[in-house]
Swiss-Prot record:
Gene3D superfamilies referenced in this protein's UniProt entry, alphabetically: Luciferase-like domain
Family classification: Belongs to the bacterial luciferase oxidoreductase family.
Binding-site positions, FMN: H10, S44, M76, T201, G202, F203, S204, Y205, N206, S207, P208, S209
GO cellular component: cytosol
EC number: 1.14.14.155
Triggers of expression: By (-)-camphor and, to a lesser extent, by (+)-camphor.
Keyword Flavoprotein: yes
Name of the protein in question: 3,6-diketocamphane 1,6-monooxygenase
Reactions accelerated catalytically: (1S,4S)-bornane-2,5-dione + FMNH2 + O2 = (1S,4S)-5-oxo-1,2-campholide + FMN + H2O + H(+)
Record note on pH: Optimum pH is 7.0.
InterPro entries named among the record's database cross-references: Bact_Lucif_Oxidored, Luciferase-like_dom, Luciferase-like_sf
Assembly with partners or alone: Homodimer. Likely forms a loose transient complex with a P.putida flavin reductase that provides the required FMNH(2) to the enzyme.
Role this protein plays: Involved in the degradation and assimilation of (-)-camphor, which allows P.putida strain NCIMB 10007 to grow on this enantiomer of camphor as the sole carbon source. Catalyzes the FMNH(2)-dependent lactonization of 3,6-diketocamphane via a Baeyer-Villiger oxidation to produce the unstable lactone 5-oxo-1,2-campholide with (S,S) configuration, that presumably undergoes spontaneous hydrolysis to form 2-oxo-Delta(3)-4,5,5-trimethylcyclopentenylacetate. Is also able to convert (-)-camphor to the corresponding lactone in vitro.
Length: 378
């Protein structure tokens, strides 16, 4: 079997885009991805960042589902500390029923302190980096309690939970006369009657999210941050999975990366350097990565000082940019160095004004790159 492909839509829209433009670009991206055989689309949830400005991914998922046939969708991720688990469990269950098997669930603790602050959580560090203290630990505790409540609600069995962070329950269904349906409770359990597949993202070297994924047999999604971190993610995930009695399977591992294909290497590099991807990295991602030490892994792989890691360095040495043959070679080299993965999750960017280069890239990745990448052994 060959590697699967997916999109991850943060959405990295440049400041000044309207909410309607962002929404429309998400729908167009989903339709194009579905038409060229992309397997999945993850849509981020953020409440504070101007470049990552989708607070309700479920709205985009519901709208895109009506215009697509095969592609699966996931919020990536619902930030569990920011929402009441009973409300979230009900919404997730209903949306998964609407999508009839094309839904999986991404969960997270929240990457940005500003968003946590908006939800009443002060002094939280970057949950996907090494910063943060007790409040960051509390975010991870909140994730676990929220999951406990949601899974209880999906079972539709009576309970009441008085927790550290939330109180929630599920009422007992009242008995009525035969044929009397006025006392029955609506069924908002997920499609198929059991919890949906759950995925979590990890970035930092010793990612607590990867440990949680292994413990709970969730799908691990690594944000590529260098060879050492990617290898460590699989080690942490595998160790936790085996300790919990699960069998780790690399085909379930997804890796999120910056990928762009064109007919030639020269054209691909030019389109990235001069286009929306380059603009986003120069204005937003490179400054953030430097601020939080997230450039260190890339620099270490190349043996340079992180301060010397600029856009051209990333395009030439980190991103998967080039012709289909070149991108295939780069992925195979990463497989050789890290052990491989099952899904390449392509980072989406703001090609709203001129979609053609991006749509061509997605088609080349799906049809000319992915089929040549064989799934790794477990």
């Amino acid at each position: 079997m060959a590697m699967e492909t997916g999109l991850i839509f943060h959405p990295y829209m440049r400041p000044g885009r309207s909410a309607r433009q962002t929404f429309d670009w998400g729908i167009k991206s989903a339709v194009q991805a579905d038409s060229v055989g992309i397997d999945s689309m993850m849509i981020s949830e953020h409440a504070s960042q101007i470049w990552e400005n989708i607070p309700n991914p479920e709205l985009l998922i519901a709208a895109a589902a009506l215009q697509t046939k095969n592609i699966k969708f996931a919020p990536m991720a619902h930030l569990l500390p920011h929402q009441h688990p009973a409300k979230l469990a009900t919404m997730i269950g209903w949306l998964s029923q609407i999508l009839e098997g094309r839904y999986f669930l991404g969960i997270g603790a929240g990457a940005y302190p500003q968003a946590s602050y908006m939800h009443g959580i002060r002094n939280a560090g970057q949950s996907n980096t090494a910063t943060g203290g007790e409040e960051t630990k509390n975010l991870n505790d909140m994730v676990r309690e929220s999951l406990f409540i949601m899974e209880k609600i999906w079972k539709r069995e009576p309970f009441f939970h008085e927790g550290k962070y939330w109180d929630a329950g599920y009422p007992e269904e009242l008995e009525g006369e035969e044929g009397d349906e006025q006392h029955k409770l609506a069924d908002f359990s997920p499609w198929g009657g059991k919890a949906p597949e759950i995925a979590v993202t990890g970035f930092s070297y010793n990612s607590p999210s990867m440990r949680l994924a292994g413990e709970r047999n969730f799908k691990p999604v690594s944000i590529f941050s260098g060879l050492d971190a990617l290898k460590r993610h699989w080690e942490v995930y595998s160790e936790a999975a085996i300790e919990a009695g699960h069998t780790p399977d690399r085909s379930r591992h997804a890796v999120s990366h910056t990928v762009f294909c064109a007919d030639t290497d020269k054209e691909a590099k030019r389109l990235v350097m001069e286009g929306p991807i380059g603009y986003c990295f120069e204005r937003y991602l490179i400054p953030i990565w430097r601020r939080f030490g997230m450039m260190d892994g890339y620099a270490k792989d190349a043996g340079i000082d992180p301060v010397d890691a600029d856009l051209e360095f990333l395009v030439d040495n980190v991103f998967l940019v080039g012709s289909p043959d070149t991108v295939t070679e780069k992925i195979n080299a990463l497989f050789e160095a890290t052990g491989g993965w099952g899904t390449l999750q392509v980072e989406a960017h703001d090609y709203y004004d001129d979609p053609a280069p991006w749509f061509q890239s997605l088609e080349l990745i799906s049809k000319e790159v992915a089929p040549k990448i064989l799934l790794p052994k477990r």
